[in-house]
Amino acid sequence: MGVEFVDLFNQWASSYDDTVSGNDPEYKEVFEGYEDMLELLAGLSISPVMEFGVGTANLTRKMIGQNKVVIGIEPSSEMRRIANLKCPEAAIYDGDFLNYPQLITPIQSIVSSFAFHHLTTSEKIEAIQKFDDKLESKGKVIFIDTLFKDEAHKQALIKNAEKSGHLNLAQDLQEEYYGYLDELKEMFSNQGFEVSFKQINNYAWLIQAKKGE
C-alpha cells in the first residue's frame, strides 16, 4: 500500500466518521446503510478476528461488543490514535494488508470494511496468499468493499457521480484500485478459497471467502 494513502488517512481521520455517517453528500450513497453493514460484518466474524484497516474502530467496537477477540491492523497513526480512544479493549497495531506484526494468536476470520481497494492487483493477490497462510483451517475472509460487476458497471457509476456533481467520488472511482467481481473471484479461487459475493448497495458488496481443510 502506497504512502500516499497513509497521508490521506491521517488527514481524513478527524472527519471520517462524518463521511461514513452520510453527512458528506458526495459519499452518502457509497456508505448507505453503513451501520447495518458493520452489524452484518461483525455478526459474521469468528473470534479470534484479525481486522485490516481499522480506521476509527467503528467495526472493531461492534465485534468487541460481541465479546470477540480482535487484533486490529491500521497504517495511519492518527486513525490508530482515535481507534485506541474509542476502543481501548482491542489490540491495534501499526501495519497494513501486506506488512504487519507476526502474532501467535490463531486467526479464525479476517475482516475489513472499505479498505481492500487500496491495494493494486498484484498486492491483492499477495494479500490473499497471506490470508491463506494466516487463517486456521476452514477460516474465513469477510470483507465489505466497493467493487465493480464489470467495466460497464464502473463507467455507469462514474457517469452517475459526474452527473450528480460528485467530482471527488468520480475521481476516486477512476483512480483507486477497486476490483472487478470476476477478477476478485479468480484471485480467491486460485488460492483455494470458496468465495461468494452479495451486493449491499449500489457500491458496496459483501465478500466471503472460506479456506479449505
Swiss-Prot record:
GO aspect biological process, one term: methylation
Disulfides per UniProt: none
GO molecular function terms listed in the Swiss-Prot or TrEMBL record: S-adenosylmethionine-dependent methyltransferase activity
Signal peptide annotation: none
UniProt entry tagged with the keyword S-adenosyl-L-methionine: yes
Superkingdom field: Bacteria
Positions with a binding annotation for S-adenosyl-L-methionine: G53, E74, D96
Enzyme class: transferase
Keywords: Methyltransferase, S-adenosyl-L-methionine, Transferase
Listed Pfam families: Methyltransf_25
InterPro entries with a match to the protein in the record: Methyltransf_25, SAM-dependent_MTases_sf, Uncharacterised_MeTfrase_YrrT
EC identifiers of the protein: 2.1.1.-
Family of the protein in this entry: Belongs to the methyltransferase superfamily. YrrT family.
Biological function: Could be a S-adenosyl-L-methionine-dependent methyltransferase.
Protein name: Uncharacterized methyltransferase YrrT
Organism: Halobacillus halophilus (strain ATCC 35676 / DSM 2266 / JCM 20832 / KCTC 3685 / LMG 17431 / NBRC 102448 / NCIMB 2269)
